[in-house]
Amino acid sequence: MDVKRSFLFLQGPHGPFFRKLGEELSRRGALVTRVNLCGGDFLDWPSHSCNYRGRTSDWSEWIGDLMAKKEVTDLLVYGDWRPHHREAVHIARLHGIRVWAFDEGYLRPDWITMEEGGVNGNSTLPNDPESVRSECQDCTCEPGAIQTENPLFKRQLKAWWYGFFSFVGLPFFPFYRTHRPYSHCAELFSGWIPHFFTAKKRMASSEKALRRIGDTPYFLFPLQLDSDSQVRRYSPFSGMKEAIAYIMTSFAQHAPQDTLLVIRNHPLDNGLIRYDRFIRSFSRACGIEERTVFVESGNGREMIRKARAVVLLNSTMGLQALEMGKSVYCVGKAIYAMPGLAENGAQDSLAHFWKSPLAPDAKLLRDFEKVVRCRTLINGNFYFGEGMKLAVQGCADKLLK
């Protein structure tokens, strides 16, 4: 007799996506349990859920008991590296429970990532050309995606509301501490709110900086969120300022004198770190103030198109750059860093890359993206309209397959 599937949801992307996916799985006959850890979680899934208000030191035993009581067969988490998630994942694996990790799409736009076992640094995707080509031969998925609307402002709004409710919910979840390096209170009142009111000025400054570049050849360095696990767990750096210092120093020492370094901020940055001030100060110390350009915004694809090459930690912008035929160097651990695609320290030094960047192998890239789509991607988005509905249906189909 088939065992009835029992899905346990922990924290998901900001907004109702996990709740809607749970409702769809329940409609199809599965058992669904959700655990809220903070006020933001409660906002996203207020009913038919349970709240954990205990200490972090008691979490492992509590979640293990819940898994046994609910006879959980599948654990769903957004990001497998958060402390609460990490402990739950270990317990789930011990008891043979499937782990499904979600994240923004490895390929964008119009895709989300849902990978069994783990994502990013914990991914089991093939990481050498021979394995990629071998697995690609068995892939039968369709290459196209239905385009969906996914406005950046709506994503920011969901993040703001999540942070606000996490802050006001502290009396009800007194022991919860965010996995992020800053509290929700600090992010909201010292970051997002002043960041919002200076947006117009910052955009004007960015437009002026982009005009200054003109036809000068440049290397593009797209920043990632300072709180991103890709930065803090899967790179040699403790945060983005350390990464910026490393890359700027290398650029000053080894890049051709006729090139610029264009540093683009992440569009969802909360504004707590004044990157403009730090980069201005550090560029002066390195003697490259006139060769360094920092922008808060700008069309990412257009900036990639005009760049000589792209240097980054492990952002998915690296895959976009490879798709556009650009050379990419990863300073951190990335799923696409392998011979023939993006370079990294295992293949060559950053010092050499500034002078002689290697173009990607287009056929290998097509094979790799096909494997990624077949193994990990669902068409749609986490946040808005028809794209969310599409992703919910696709995830439910795959989970119950």
Kindly give the residue locations of the regions a language model identified.
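Donor nucleotide-activated moiety binding/catalytic core segment of transferases
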Residues: 55-69, 267, 272-316, 323
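A short helix->loop->beta-strand "cap" motif at the edges of active sites that frequently abuts
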Residues: 94-99, 259, 325-326
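Leloir-type glycosyltransferase catalytic cores
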Residues: 126-170, 340-401
